[in-house]
Each structure stands twice: as C-alpha cells, then as structure tokens.
A protein has these predicted regions:
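Conserved acetyl-CoA pyrophosphate-binding loop and the N-cap/start of the following alpha-helix
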Residues: 1-2, 141, 145-153
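Conserved catalytic-core motifs of GNAT/GCN5-like acyltransferases
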Residues: 16-18, 36-51, 164-166, 182-199
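Conserved GNAT-fold acetyl-CoA-binding loop/helix
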Residues: 76-102
Length: 208
C-alpha cells in the first residue's frame, strides 16, 4: 500500500530505504518487495550512545507508461542495447529492424519504462496479451535490477509468463532461465523470416 501510494498518488520515480547490515530480516523484506541493493554507506549513523553504524541502501524504481514523445529515446536505447548484446546481428539487420521497431513494433505493444535518478529511460518492456514481446536495458544500466523488476511486473501484475529469445543471445537466455523460465519450443527463423533462430520460453509452474 505504501509503495502504491508513493508511485501512484505522489508520482515518485524512486523510493529508497536503508537498513543496518546485521538486520537480515529487513533485508529479506526489502528484496521480497522488489527493492534493489545499491551499496553501503559506511559510518553513516552516530547513535546517542556513541556507536557508529553502516547503512545498506536499497531502492525500487517506479514502472511507468511512456508517451509517443518518448519513442525517439526508446529507439536510441534499443539500438545501444542491441549493439551491446546482439553481436550476432549484422549492421544491415540492425538498420532493417530499426524503423520497424520505431514505427510498427513500439505502437503495437503495451510499453512500460523505468527511468533512472536523472530522469533518463534506463529500460523498457513491451507486452502483448500473452507474451513479453521485448525487453531492453541501456548498457550503462545493466546489472542494476531494472530488467528483473520489469519481468516480475509482467508476471505478477499482468499474468504474462511467456517470452521469445534469440537463440544466439546467450546473455538474455541465461537471464530468463535464472528467473525460472524454461525452453518449450524453437523456430529456425525470426518473425520476419530472417535466419535468427528463436527460442520460446515459459515460466515454470513453481515460479508462478
């Protein structure tokens, strides 16, 4: 309820929380609610009895809907992410897909974004009725939990448990398998008939 009030009523882009390193219960509660560990503030608090404590810092970013005015930023993020992770794509393929993503794929899905503390889009996800159609994270923002937060939102809030992944995108495949997805099928080509095999994944029952 507190998170919903902060994000929905106050329109906060980020909610932070601190706890002591020895307070394992608080850490578990924060992680269970989607908070991401950011780092430790050393000697952050001087108590009344003279003890000095560290603080572990956590944050949870808001998930918002972009507008059409955000599409140019989204396509720039898409290209940076693809060049960082889709090494199997040729330059010709990237230039082929770029206008399709901008003009056809983005308007065709329900888009969700996460902005960083500077207001820039750090990651975005596109959903259809039954499938996670796309997930892209800016290379500078990878490893911060943005992708995981978006996927957990798709699973818990939208009840979507399927995703397609390029077979040659090992990083994405490992990411989804770590979250509990398993391979249930394979196509030799992508949706445009290009020679990039696609793996069909679904969340295992014990992870739903």
């Amino acid at each position: 309820a507190v998170l919903n009030y902060g994000f929905n009523e106050l329109q906060l882009s980020l909610i932070t929380a601190n706890c002591y390193p020895h307070n394992k219960r608080s850490q578990q509660v924060l992680k269970r609610n989607g908070f991401i560990y950011e780092g430790t503030l050393h000697q952050a608090e001087l108590t009344y009895n003279g003890n000095i404590y560290d603080h572990e810092c956590y944050y949870i970013p808001n998930i918002a809907r972009p507008t059409e005015q955000d599409y140019d930023e989204l396509i720039r993020l898409w290209e940076k992410s693809v060049r960082s992770t889709h090494h199997f794509l040729t330059e010709e393929s990237i230039q082929f897909y770029k206008p399709l993503i901008r003009n056809h794929y983005l308007p065709a899905v329900a888009l969700f974004i996460i902005r960083n503390s500077h207001g820039k889009i750090a990651a975005f996800m596109g959903l259809s009725d039954e499938l996670i159609e796309m997930l892209f994270v800016h290379p500078d923002e990878q490893g911060k939990g943005y992708g995981k937060r978006l996927i957990e939102y798709a699973i818990r809030q939208k009840q979507i448990d399927k995703v397609d992944v390029n077979e040659d995108n090992d990083q994405a495949l490992r990411f989804y398998q770590h979250l509990g997805f398993e391979i249930i099928g394979r196509d030799e080509t992508d949706s445009m008939g290009k020679p990039y095999p696609i793996l069909h994944l679904q969340l295992t029952d014990d992870k739903k």
